[in-house]
Amino acid sequence: MARVGRVGFLTLAVVFHLMYAYSIFDIYFVSPIVSGMRSFGVEREASAEAPAKRLVLFVADGLRADKAFQALPDPDAPSDLENDEPIYLAPFIRSRALSHGTFGISHTRVPTESRPGHVALIAGLYEDVSAVTTGWKLNPVDFDSVFNRSRHTWSWGSPDILPMFKEGAVPGRIDADTYGEEAEDFSADATKLDIWVFDKVKELFASAKKDPELDAKLREDKLVFFLHLLGLDTTGHAYRPYSKEYLRNIKLVDKGVQEITQLVEDFYGDGKTSFVFTADHGMSDWGSHGDGHPDNTRTPLVVWGSGVASPRYTHEGTITGHEDGVSADWGLDSVQRNDVAQADVAALMAYLVGLDFPTNSVGQLPLGYLDTSPKDKALAALANAQGVLEMYRVKEEQKRDALLRYTPFEPLADNGETSVEARLERIKTLISNKSYDASIQLSSELLLTALEGLRYLQTYDWLFLRTIVSLGYLGWIAYALTTVIDLHVLHGKSESNRTTFSIMFFSSILVALFSVLLYQGSSWRYYLYALFPIFFWEEVFARRKALLAGREILLGHVHSVSGYFAFAIQLLLYVGVLEALVQSYFHRDIFTVCFILGGFWPITYGTKFLGQHKLLSASWALGCFLMSIFTLLPANKVEDMMMISCGSLLMFLTGLLYLIFERSILGQKRSSDPNSVVSSCGSRTIMGAQVGMILLALIVTRSSVASLQAKQGLPLGNQVLGWAILVSSLLLPFLHRLYPNSHYLHRLMVIFLTFSPIFIILTISYEGLFYFVFCMTLLAWVRLEQAIYIHTTAPTREQDHSVANGSLPAKKPSPGNTVVVEGQPYRYRTLSVSDARVALFFFFLLQSGFFSTGNIASVSSFSLDSVYRLIPIFNPFAQGALLILKLLIPFAIISANLGILNHRLEVAPSALFMVVMSISDVMTLNFFYMVRDEGSWLEIGTTISHFCIASFLCTFVAVLEFLSELFISGVDFGHPATTVGSAVAKAVNGSVACGHSPDSDISGEDSTSVGITAKADPDARS
């Protein structure tokens, strides 16, 4: 096929990585939802009633198990009270656990978000991990649930949760009464949300006394009442779960639950109501959730009322459920703790109210919560197992029909006495013989085996898909390296060399794969997964001569064994850095070690180099030392106005000092040209406005923080002004086009000032300090790289030594390497092995731009405190966009610096970016095999996050390539025909204009950027 150019390569990189980033969800997290199953319920005699006629479900959104049961300081106690003894904040719920019902911990799965949590509670189903985003908009639950099985369900609460169950159920079966989205204000008192729910329930029963039709409807059986209490989640996000506001909200919820319980009991008076109190997820100490931290996965479960077992008091030497020590300080050691998986709650509710188990439920009925006869327990356990077996049967039929060859799950295969039918008959026989305990044991074993079978079917295609994806990533690495060599080492002079055999070979593999996928009815994504590795490896094979020619150019200088050994050591070192970056995803302090070592990097170029560039080397070392500190600081931060102010003042002073000493910094003399004077004044005025915007952003942020911390809400004026600053700071730089200053330092300062106000508004702690240090370090890096480039291209003994040891320095542009830019010849030099080190530095700094202020065990590491200053109302897409904007700012800064570095190292604009994209998937492939879908939920969430971020960062490099061109558009690097390569010419030929030393544009003024240029010898040889 035709050779891909720069745009084609970058586009292919984006498409490939976006597709393959999704591959983990097709491999590890396929939706477990299937349809076509019959439902199963407990077989009762015609005259027998269900344990309860109705069920009331309380879900305290975001309530941690420990906060529900621990003794904690009274949030309403006077501050001057001497005897501030801890109290139990939920005495009524606690009394249900101690005297009236059964309690335990409900263990949730990741992602610990509201939609997956409610789906598990109400449908008994764990949605695939990617379903978390569907909770941010109306996306009906299109599978069976307890609500859908009920005769009627009344629900009250959040507009984010209730509609998805109502819209996905049988029409008219669910009533959903919600407050408006504007009520979810993080800056307001969130307890009003729970009060609203309790009041609405009271209104319903009050209306029934006046409405006979409603009264009759309420007295039917198989009814469910669902109270979604969002106050704790909203309060926890805003104030943290250890705050007085959160603790006060627990007291309010407990009081409300008590009132509703009493109201229902008084209304019916028949004692046939079951009550379930639980939470969809917990909350970390930082007010976040989403990952698998135990604070997020442990939620309270208290069940009482009709059909529920009374507390089982523990005795010494017996199993109490408290052995793990989690509940040691809850004061509940006297009663047994019965832990469940979150999906088990759906099975429990269905049993209590006499419903069939939801057809997609994988929950195991917790028999310890039931107050019923052994026979009923045995029948319930059997029905529970039959429901899960039915789901396995349907999924197996679908898998068998789709595959060319299917290998059944051995424990559930049709093998005579061990067949499913034989086991079910044995269980029924045991029940008939009143051997209830034995039948329950067999039912439990059969259910667990069915779950293992579902797991087997879920992972059936793993080997096939993982092999294809692995070959795809390896193929991309090989293809990208081949393309880099073809475009930037051989300059497109190599030709493809396809043979008839190779065409037939790769085509046959592709046809075979597509045929299998077509027969199996696979998703369209599978075809792309298969297409990419075939395409990449075919291209690599076709351009194998380019690889050989590139090897001659890049390593042709290496002839001795010691040279090859030195090159091998260098290669291993690069791979070691990439593997260190992999580990840095788990241990941020690896960045600290790397930065400290990197600070000494200039020493490797000898004492002469250090002597010529003392200030520059010191600046780089200082930047590295300061950067090493940030990854030692906690990733989870609390709001610190002092840190915000310090970072803001550093940004302000940087801009102010630049305005004062601009001419000295740029090495420009005062001009007498009227047009130049006007342009200079205009540019300085605009930059002055940018500097002033920083100060204004600090003032507004301090005011907003003070108001929010005082619980006075976000003033409208602050919100409007905050948005005005954010938008205007992004628009102001465009005014510089009216009064252009093309010096690269000026351009970098404009970009720095552009993002400073945004960073101030969206920072909560030390991020502003990081932004300042990061920009300073990048500038030192750009100037240091150019100094090294000039140093290593000079024909010195140091250069000869580096060649002998296998490290070929960069060469200055040769006359043949010419492209046309704006109608003029522009020469780029050939890439060398040493440029891989520059690309690796860029990739390291790119990663540090993300990790220095956070980690990615989960996205929830990033606090929402800052976005409350702009959007106090719950709006996940808008708030998420602001957080992403904050995360992307360092990437924008580094793209501008690399764009300038490309020019100053005289390489093609896309060259270094392409090298980065060639090597970065070494990390991505590591994380692909680290992804887990079982084990601790913290590990699962972490591995997903790691793979996705690594893959998206690689994709983002392609975007940065285009962004860098935008940022440096119009920057003056001198006349293309004369100044490209002038720095090298000065070092090689010694012909320096205006009396500057060869390094003057590095350590002092930048001569090539302000028109003080040297004549490059057009015939100079590399």
UniProtKB/Swiss-Prot annotation:
Compartments reported by the entry: Endoplasmic reticulum membrane
One GO cellular component, as annotated: endoplasmic reticulum membrane
Record GO biological process: cell wall organization; GPI anchor biosynthetic process
Protein keywords: Cell wall biogenesis/degradation, Endoplasmic reticulum, Glycoprotein, GPI-anchor biosynthesis, Membrane, Transferase, Transmembrane, Transmembrane helix
Ranges of the Cytoplasmic topological domain: 1-6, 488-498, 582-589, 636-640, 707-713, 859-880, 932-947
Membrane topology: Multi-pass membrane protein
Pathway: Glycolipid biosynthesis; glycosylphosphatidylinositol-anchor biosynthesis
Residue spans crossing the bilayer: 7-27, 467-487, 499-519, 561-581, 590-610, 615-635, 641-661, 686-706, 714-734, 750-770, 771-791, 838-858, 881-901, 911-931, 948-968
Region feature (Disordered): 998-1022
GO molecular function per UniProt: mannose-ethanolamine phosphotransferase activity
UniProt-annotated glycosylation sites, renumbered to this chain: 148, 433, 805, 989
Top-rank lineage group of the source organism: Eukaryota
Signal peptide: none
Topological domains annotated Lumenal: 28-466, 520-560, 611-614, 662-685, 735-749, 792-837, 902-910, 969-1022
CDD domains: GPI_EPT_1
Family the entry assigns: Belongs to the PIGG/PIGN/PIGO family. PIGN subfamily.
Protein role: Ethanolamine phosphate transferase involved in glycosylphosphatidylinositol-anchor biosynthesis. Transfers ethanolamine phosphate to the first alpha-1,4-linked mannose of the glycosylphosphatidylinositol precursor of GPI-anchor.
Name of the molecule in the record: GPI ethanolamine phosphate transferase 1
Naturally occurring in which organism (per UniProt): Aspergillus oryzae (strain ATCC 42149 / RIB 40)
Gene: mcd4
